[in-house]
Amino acid sequence: MDSLPLSNIFHRKTRTVMTSAGVALGVALVVLTVGLVHGFLYDQGHRNAAVAAEIMMNPPGAGFGFQLSTNLSMPTDAIDKLRSIPGVSDAVAVGRYTHGLGVVDGIDYDSFTKVSALRVVEGRAALGGDEAMIDRVLQASRKLKIGNTIQEFDRPFKIVGIYEPESLGRIKVPLGTLQNSMNRPGFCSTIFIKVADPSQQDELARRIQEQFPKNNLFMTRELPVLYATGIPAFNTFLKVVVGLSVIVSSLVVLLTMYTTVTERTRQIGILKSLGASRQWIAGEVEKEALLITLAGVIAGLAISVAGKYAVQRFTPLSIELEPSWLLYALGLGLLSGSLGALYPAARAANQDPIAALSYE
C-alpha cells in the first residue's frame, strides 16, 4: 500500500503530465514575472547611478526613474542658479521621455560627458536634428548598426553613434530635439549636479534644497537601493500575480485529485474495509498531490531558467532569478498542491466503506 501514490501517478501518465504542466506554468509565471520586475528595477537603478554626478534634482512632486513625469516640467534656467552655489562643479539638464518600458534621453553631449563616463565608441555623437545614439545592449538585441533608423515621436531617427557604458535610457537624442518634439523648449526632466568635493555632497544637497525647497533631490549613490525597494505599483502587481498563480495551481491539482478519488472509490472502500484509517487515506492522497506538484515545480524552474536566457538573448530586458525567490516559488508550488488536495483527501477519508464498495 505504500506504493499507492506512485502506482496511481504512473497508471495515469497523461493526466499526471498535464497536471504537472499546469503547476509548472504557474511557477514559471511567478518566477519570470518577479525576475523581470526585479531585473528591470535593478537595471534601472544601476544605469541611473552610472552617472558620475552625485545629486539628481527632479521637479516638484516627481519621484525617481519611471515615476518622473513624461512631460519636461523643470525650467533649464535653474542650471545657472545651481552653478552659482559654492561647491557645485557643474549642473547638466537631461530630458526624459518614457514610452512603455523604454526611455529616450535628451542630452547635450558635450555637457553630459562632464558628469558621466559616457563615450561614443562607434560612429559619432548625436549633436542635432533627428539623430540618435544607442548603447551596446540595444544594438545587440535589435541587431542595429550605424545608419539604421529607429522610430521615436512618430518619425525616424538616424543612428549615428554607439555609446558605452550603459547609463539612464538606452536611446539618446539631442536635448533640443526632444524639447521641440514635446513642444517644451527651455524645460527638462531632471538636472544632474556634479559636486566639487564628494565628501561634502550631503551638506551641499542640504544647501541646494534650501534654495529649491519644492524640488526633490536624490543622491545617485542611493538610486540602486531605491529601485531595489521597488515602486509601490510593481509590488502590488507582484502580489496579484503570486496570488493568482497559487489559486490556479490549486484548482488544477484539486480537479486532478478529485477525479482520481472518484475513479478509485471502490479501491478506497476496500482499503477502509481492510482497516485503513481516515488519516492514512487522506495522507496517501496528499502524497500523490505533492509528488505531482513537485514534478511541476521542478519543470517550472527549468522553464524559468530557459526563459531567462531566451529573453536576455533576444531583448534588452534583464531578468534576475534570485535564489530566495526560487525557494519561495518551490514553497508556493508545494503549498498550492497541498491546498488543492485538501478537499479530495477529506472526501476520500470520509467515504463510507459499504457505499464505496457498491460504487460502479
Model-identified regions with their sequence ranges:
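Hydrophobic, regular-secondary-structure patches
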Residues: A28-V103, R206-E210, K214-N216
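Peri-transmembrane interface segments
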Residues: Q44, R206-L251, T260-T265, I270-L271, ...
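A short beta-strand structural signal in non-transmembrane regions
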Residues: I55-M56, L138-Q139, V160-P165, G186-F212, ...
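Transmembrane alpha-helical interface segments in multi-pass membrane proteins
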Residues: S245, Y258, R266-Q312, Y328, ...
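C-terminal membrane-exit region of the final transmembrane helix in multipass inner-membrane proteins
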Residues: W325-E360
